[in-house]
Amino acid sequence: MALDGVGAADDVWWKSAVVYQIYPRSFADSDGDGIGDLAGITARLDYLADLGVDVLWLSPVYPSPQDDNGYDISDYRDIEPMFGTLADFDRLLAAVHERGMRLVMDLVVNHTSDEHPWFRESREGPNSAKRNWYWWRPARKDVDTTGDRAGEESPDAPGAPPNNWGSFFSGSAWQHDAGSDEYYLHLFSPKQPDLNWENPEVRQAVHALMRWWLDRGVDGFRMDVINLISKDPELPDGRLHGDGLYGDGSPYYICGPRVHEYLQEIHREVFAGRPERLLTVGEMPGVTLEQARLFTDPGRGEVDMVFQFEHVGLDFGRHKFDVRPLRLTDLKASLGRWQTGLAEVGWNSLYWNNHDQPRIVSRFGDDGPEHRVRSATMLATVLHLHRGTPYIYQGEELGMTNAPFATIEDVHDIEALGHYAQAVRAGEDPDRVLDGLRAHGRDNARTPMQWDASEHAGFTTGTPWLPANPNHITINAAAAVADPNSVYHHYRRLIALRHTEPAVVHGDFTMLLAEDERLYAFTRRHRDTTLLVLANFTGEAVAVPAGLAAEWARAPLVLGNAGPIDEMVLRPWEARVHRHV
């Protein structure tokens, strides 16, 4: 595949690319300290090149106190020592480019660490030169300060938080600072204070650090929660839902009043005049389809594609850890809506997994020994045949599964621990709460990459920061590479199909059998070629409806996951791609 884009709407390079996300802490450890590092990634690049991916997305490797595993950054222009040095990074970047791949950095600029020099200076007092780089507000004296709504992180605070917003990580979104007797805003952890993008000095500082990395040779950015950077300056109270302690502030910070202005400014100040090889991806929780069209319209100069979360919230009940069964019709409605909605303008990221999601084969498939391989490859086929740029999260190509967490002491993730503490304090059954964490907790994605059957899965010679899944004895890269029928080789075939079949990249999307609760079916049509994708989302054989079966019975099979076929009946978890020319 050619590396240089040509800029035409249907010919930009990233539309036919496949991205592989690396979570450095858990990918490969070169020095035996139990934590993955840059040298470990460099040593495994041939594996990724053989897989066929085009872009590596590197989760944060900047210096960080690691309160949120690197998404709390204390220095944007260096490398976290446990991952290596800038020299190690430069070697990794050169080795990636030598293999014809690109490297995209994770950019986290909605917030910094509270240990970043910017925030330390801001915290010095109301007269600090950087006070307005963050969202500081005085306490409210006219609100009841008893109970959790006053801010559980600061029970001795003299007044209530400036508004009632809740944090994504449980509790209040405000932290009291005793030194100035004011509160600062943190939509995530108290150690992740939100930057004030209303201040042009903040924006200029962000532009400068982005240019610094691009000048170093990186190929773009995945922008973390980038649609949260614009807040309503009035910071109004959010609506309370049910008996909730905290208000929903999202209408005042999700896709806020100046977010398009800020992204267009980044495009002008950072990317203008640079080669078209660069990629910008915006992670956007809560983004609507209509908003995504604006963000990804090439004529507006904002981002190339978005990460949206609609389809990975379909098995949520009252909240993320209240797990309910997936209804296939809901999944089809969601993915189909985004396919048709971005058909004329815009572009989408295709993903099942990332560092925040549980393993897809455990979530929407069957991770038991009988059906794990077939359900993992079925899910991969469905995703990769949609229109958009596919993302593979490390280990997904092996069919890695959720991990067995026996007790709350086995859980490391700050989000899960915060939810557990709040839920148990509110009187919920601890065992039931833990069941929700087992199903949807972020630690499921963060167990070490399973390289081989040796101790600690070949990830480290030391003690891993998070234990390897015990099933690495059978589910690992060495075994998968050696087995032509493995999940790994199915991913290789899917990637090769995207690189060689224009209908996969550019074809129109048409959903079929929208109300069928067992079969997922759609076509991709480009010029004289039509592809039919059929997938069985159950553990039982399912016949293709007669009309569709008759129309496609003689169409050649392009790709499948269940061996030879002789009839239009899909075996458990089977997927097929047929071609009409």
Predicted features along the sequence, with ranges:
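Active-site and adjacent substrate-binding regions of carbohydrate-active enzymes
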Residues: 2-581
